[in-house]
Structures are given as C-alpha cells and as structure tokens.
C-alpha cells in the first residue's frame, strides 16, 4: 500500500435483487456498507484502467517516496517515548507508522488539539465479526488493537509538519 490509487470500477448487470444484493456485499469485504460487519466472506479487488495507469506513474517515484517515509518514521520514532510497532524491523515500507501506548486516547486527544490526525485501525478484529464469531480468541491481538494508533507518515509531509508531529507526540 505504498503507492496510492483512486476510485473503483467494474459492473454487474442483473434484474435479480438477490444477486445484486450479494454482488454488492462481495465487492466490499462481505459487508453491505463500510460501517457494517461482514456477513459472509468477500473481496475488495476493484481497479479501473485509470487506476492502473496512476499506479504505473507511482511506481516511477516509489523509491523516492519510500526513502522519505523512512526518514519521517526514523525522526518520529526518535522523538516519541511510545513503543513503535516497527522499531525492530530492519526494512519496512512504513505505509502506516504505528505507535503503542496504554494512554492511546489521551495521546490522540493531545494530537487532535494540535491539529494532528491519528487513526485507530482495525477497531473490530476479524474474529469478532459476526461471520467468524465462536472461533479462537486472540488475546495478544486484542491487546495490540487496544493500544495501537497511527500518525501521519505520508511522503508529502513537509519538514515543518514532521517537526510539529514530533513535538506533540510526547
């Protein structure tokens, strides 16, 4: 996920409501809408020709963008007292810069007050989705879900923006 793409494409033509409803769910990870839980397995593999062309352009810049994300990640890891989920990896794409703290909510509020976005990914673990309930419990994954958050790490960030994030990621 280090090269962005936009939009989606493809079409299914049918006058059968049941088929149309199922096709809509299959194209969105088995969900009716993005805010709902999966009710059966599905995919998200939609890509138009235009998206493909944009990705090809992105490939020309991917090494440069990767170096910039690595530089930003190194700086923010150095400035932050919080554990970084990627701190022990020699090579990482840094498509997401994940920090961990039991004080996640407080940290996110502080970042928000200073105009810095932070995100919690994977609020609902796959084994908690209605479709997969009743299987294994994953206590380590659950704990990581509760303490992990990401901060901006796009290659487009200016040095001043990176310093601003580093100043408030404390």
Description of each model-found segment:
Residues 15-170:
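PLP-dependent aminotransferase class I/II
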């Amino acid at each position: 996920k280090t090269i962005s793409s936009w939009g989606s494409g493809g079409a299914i033509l049918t006058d059968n409501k049941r088929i149309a409803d199922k096709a809509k769910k299959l194209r969105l990870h088995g969900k009716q809408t993005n805010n709902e839980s999966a009710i059966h397995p599905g995919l998200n593999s939609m890509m138009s020709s235009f998206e493909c062309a944009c990705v090809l352009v992105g490939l020309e810049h991917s090494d440069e963008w990767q170096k910039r994300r690595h530089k930003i990640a190194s700086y923010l890891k150095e400035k932050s007292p919080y554990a970084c989920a990627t701190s022990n990896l020699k090579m990482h794409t840094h498509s997401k810069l994940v920090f961990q703290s039991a004080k996640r909510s407080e940290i996110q509020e502080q970042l928000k007050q200073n105009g810095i976005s932070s995100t919690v990914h994977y609020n609902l673990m796959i084994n908690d989705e209605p479709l997969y309930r009743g299987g294994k419990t994953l206590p380590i994954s659950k704990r990581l879900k509760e303490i992990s958050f990401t901060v901006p790490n796009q290659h487009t960030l200016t040095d001043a923006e990176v310093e601003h994030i580093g100043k408030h990621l404390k």
